[in-house]
Curated annotation (Swiss-Prot):
It holds the Pfam family ADP_ribosyl_GH. Expressed in the rhopalia. Present in both the large and small eyes. The keyword Ribonucleoprotein does not apply. It comes from Tripedalia cystophora (Jellyfish). It comes from the Eukaryota. This is Crystallin J1C. Keywords: Eye lens protein.
């Protein structure tokens, strides 16, 4: 496979992940399944939903969730720095989410929905440690940010042999937790396979077999092979919230479906709950298989920073470290 094809797949993974996140955000964190079903029963196009159903916060349509925003911060850092530097990444993360930013707003579950973007509590706690220079500043919780935010890192370092180390460094800034790290590393290895090799129905099996044995492999394998369930039912079975392993299992259940980009994102949107990180993951996996042409141009234009992320992704793909 030519390097030009790999570069296009790397670019597609970045854009596909972030556009999917933006397309999903208006219906992020909706846990009332009956309300969700009623809203989408007669809608063939759930993306960029005009009615903001998210009960926790209100924000502009086309913007990124907190998961996509972390993805974007990493993308921007990699391009501007021409590679990963932990100290500079921590500084960029703090500047983007820390004091004086739109994310540094009072938020209380007693006064919902909040007006403006949401910052998860474990990020707030991590920011306090980042300021002190602690390189493992993250909170000890297993959350889906771990895999949802690292697509740009995979795109740059696919095939380089450095991916595991860099993934761990990035994740521990926010989530100093072994399950979070291992989940992100497995997500990265599967995405790396798609970027380097394109579509491969055996990708999951190959990556799983080559992944070090640990207590998490069975959970991932179980979700992937649970093929009798619809994705909606799989998400309900494994957990529609933000925690791991459930959130990642819901994303992994998609892998065997072999759907195109649009169908994949729509399926993920309709699964409800904490669907933005699943959209980040699924959007990256499927776009890396089909290439940049699979992402609808009108979806990119409906993404607030759509043109910017395309430009950043193009620049990053030319800096791939393989």
């Amino acid at each position: 496979m030519s390097s030009d094809q790999a570069k296009d797949r790397a670019k597609a993974a970045i854009v596909g992940s972030l556009v999917a996140d933006a397309a999903t955000q208006p219906v992020h964190w909706v846990y009332d399944h009956n309300r969700f079903y009623e809203n989408f029963r007669n809608k063939s196009e759930p993306e960029f939903n005009s009615e903001w159903l998210n009960p926790y916060y209100r924000y502009d349509n086309g913007t990124f969730s907190i998961y996509g925003e972390q993805n974007y911060v990493l993308l921007k850092h990699l391009v501007e720095n021409k590679g990963f530097n932990l100290k500079k990444y921590m500084d960029a993360y703090y500047r983007h989410f820390g004091p004086g930013t739109n994310y540094d707003q009072p938020q209380s579950r007693d006064r919902l929905p909040k007006q403006g973007p949401w910052r998860n509590e474990h990020i707030t706690r991590a920011l306090n440690k980042i300021q002190s220079g602690d390189q493992r500043s993250g909170t000890d919780v297993a959350e889906c940010d771990s895999y949802a935010m690292i697509t740009p890192l995979v795109a740059m370092y696919a095939g380089s042999g450095q991916l595991d180390s860099y993934v761990e460094q990035v994740v521990r800034v926010t989530l100093n937790n072994d399950r979070s790290v291992r989940t992100a590393q497995f997500f990265a290895k599967l995405l790396e396979h798609y970027i380097l090799h394109g579509r491969d129905p055996e990708a999951f099996r190959k990556v799983l077999n080559n992944f070090p044995d640990d207590q998490y492999k069975f959970e991932w394998q179980k979700a992937y092979y649970d093929r009798d369930l619809s994705n909606n039912d799989a998400v309900r079975k494994y957990g529609s919230g933000c925690g791991l392993p459930g959130n990642f299992q819901g994303a992994l259940h998609w892998v065997h479906r072999n759907e195109d980009y649009v169908s994949s994102v729509r399926t993920t949107i309709r699964s409800g709950g904490c669907n933005c990180p699943r959209a980040c993951g699924v959007g990256a996996w499927v776009a890396a298989q089909y290439g940049s042409q699979c992402i609808p141009s009108n979806w990119i234009s409906r993404t607030s920073r759509g043109n910017e992320i395309v430009q950043y992704a193009d620049q990053l793909s030319k800096m791939m470290q393989k």
